[in-house]
Amino acid sequence: MRRLIPIVGALVVIAAPAPSGWAQSGGTPAPDFSEPCPPVYPGDSAARERLARWMARGAADRGMPHELPVMAAIAESGLRNLSGSTYAGYFGMHESLNTGDYRGFRRNPDLQLRWFLDTAALVRQRRVAVGRPDPAADPSSFGSWIADVERPAPENRTGYQPHLGEAGDLIAGKCAAPVRDDTAAPRLEARIARPQHPLATGGVVVRLRCPDSDCLAGVTVMIGTRTTRSAAREPAPTGFTTLTAPLSRKTRRKLRAAGTARATITVIAADNAANTTSRTRVVTLEG
């Protein structure tokens, strides 16, 4: 606490200005209803267009398509902040998610949107890490991307893509384009042995690391026109991590019969902005 210094002479009274409305509200600015693409949650009773654009802006700030969260919310809740006993919010979040970073999501739509976008970013990262196309580049893949986030029953996975047009109509081009300020690919170091013995090791084995940043990594194995993929995995923070890409039963059978086969091995690293780096080597598979 600073020491008070007595003032000798007349007491000077300085009138402090009245606190602004912003300060009186506890530091939270009131929603700007003139903003066509609101940065602040507009409220449960807001028009569907404003709710959709709030979601679209949040997605764009994370480098993801405007329509993605809107399509999900239309399908899961009809674009309403539901309060069911087991599933709640705009995205039908299960009660088991009410913990950690998302604790209190039922009363906080910002947390709901954060959960959806966090999970969508992870799904996207996993896809590109195993050599699949970036779903953000193809609007026809938005539905399957959402399905990997929401994880509905298999028969309901196709229920998201039909809402692409409605989502676009609600957003109506009012929001700025998705941010793409992180374009630096992760640095990848990979060790791919030229002779491989997949029948003994359970698949094609590689060792890798991302020395400068967090990443997810995967392996693809192409033999002729057939491609198999490992699951994406986060490498250990230090040293090299071993990944194994299993071969199909048919490929193993052919390898036993032929004795050897040529394969193209690609190791891929992806960061959380879906930037990728790859290393490729042609190897000999020995039975």
Identify the residue ranges that each predicted region occupies.
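Alpha-helical scaffolds flanking conserved acidic
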Residues: 65-71, 142-147
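Short beta-strand segments
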Residues: 66-75, 81-83
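Membrane-embedded alpha-helical segments and adjacent helix-loop junctions characteristic
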Residues: 54-56, 71
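Peptidoglycan-targeting cell-wall enzymes and recognition modules
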Residues: 26-50, 54, 77-144, 148-151, ...
